[in-house]
């Protein structure tokens, strides 16, 4: 199934964080937090203004992004977990 987000919504695939600390300790699954970085896999056309114009999004498919801990709505597509969020939920693009 292929999804095309509407307006200023973005579909993000979480990027898993390291399971080992800098000191060499492994973090158990129960202690890990959900990652706050991901990759944009689909994006809408842009945000509609009050006068009907469409402002293009700053992020594009393939961008690595940082987002807030509680950002987005979890969705499952073809057995894979994604986050659907608005562009405003994106904190930064990792370059």
Curated annotation (Swiss-Prot):
CDD domains the UniProt entry points to: cpn10
Keyword Manganese: no
UniProt keyword list: Chaperone, Cytoplasm
Record localization: Cytoplasm
GO cellular component: cytoplasm
Family that this chain belongs to: Belongs to the GroES chaperonin family.
NCBIfam families cross-referenced by the UniProt entry: PRK00364.1-2 (NF001527), PRK00364.1-5 (NF001529), PRK00364.1-6 (NF001530), PRK00364.2-2 (NF001531), PRK00364.2-4 (NF001533), PRK00364.2-5 (NF001534)
Entry protein name: Co-chaperonin GroES
UniProt organism field: Pelobacter propionicus (strain DSM 2379 / NBRC 103807 / OttBd1)
Gene: groES
